[in-house]
Amino acid sequence: MNFDVSIDYLLIFIRCLQVGNAWRRLTDDSNDISWIAAGYPEGNTSELVFKAEGSGGMPEFISNLPAADVVWGAFKVVGVDNRGNTISRRPKYIFVKYLPGEVPTMKRARAGGHKGAIKQIIDAHIDVEIESASELTEEVIIQKLRAAGGAHQPTGYEFSNYSS
């Protein structure tokens, strides 16, 4: 048995577990995590690693996007349906593939091939692919959520500072 290969696969598995655990924290309503980010470790495009998480919603997620590196992440948006005496709150999860124009061609190609595997870990309501943080706006997300939703649409959305 080649232990080097086994250890490499084990490390990749553990790192994917870290991303999966971050996803579970994001979707667990008992904590205040509202976004997660994953990417490649420095100088390696064959592994996915957990990078960061936070509680500041979409604005904080955007502020943590690097200028020139690949990020896969997700954040929570709360759909609020206020119909008089009944208020319903439902979390929606947004998957983001961030691939800035400054990323080298080979790294871009590798990132494109990894999206399917990452989507196996991060299973969100909608997907957004962006090259610039300025492309990620509340209006874009609301439009995609409304297009993906059924007949019963929320009356509004919260992107941070989720009220109870």
Label every PLM stretch briefly.
Residues 1-164:
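Long, low-complexity regulatory segments enriched in Ser/Thr/Pro/Gly and acidic residues
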